[in-house]
Amino acid sequence: MKTLLAVPSCLPGGLDAEMGMHFGHCDIYTLVEIEDGKILNVSTMDNPPHQQGGCLAPVQLLAQAGVKALLAGGMGFRPLMAFHQVGIDVFFAGGAPTVGAGVNAYLAGQLPQFTEEYTCHGGAQ
């Protein structure tokens, strides 16, 4: 089964790019299509401008693109709950220096589920 994985990234995106450590403030998303533990395709998607409540806009954008999992180093509680509502699994990849390192850790089953303990507390809860 194919899975589309999104990773908040610094420009220009891609597997060699530095991970964007806060999902809502990243430059771009790297989208990685995976099947049977192998990377099939890598592409990028722009992050919409961050405005009031702006962390929820990318959730919808990524859901509409067919994303099923997201790696993140940080995010607020509201977007985490929104990802749960749209059926996107979120994994904590705070120690990954690059997108590729995060993806490899995900493929190896080394990343924990992103839970409330990892959230930052900016904005309304």
Predicted features and spans:
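Non-catalytic interface/targeting segments
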Residues: 1-53, 57, 85, 91-125
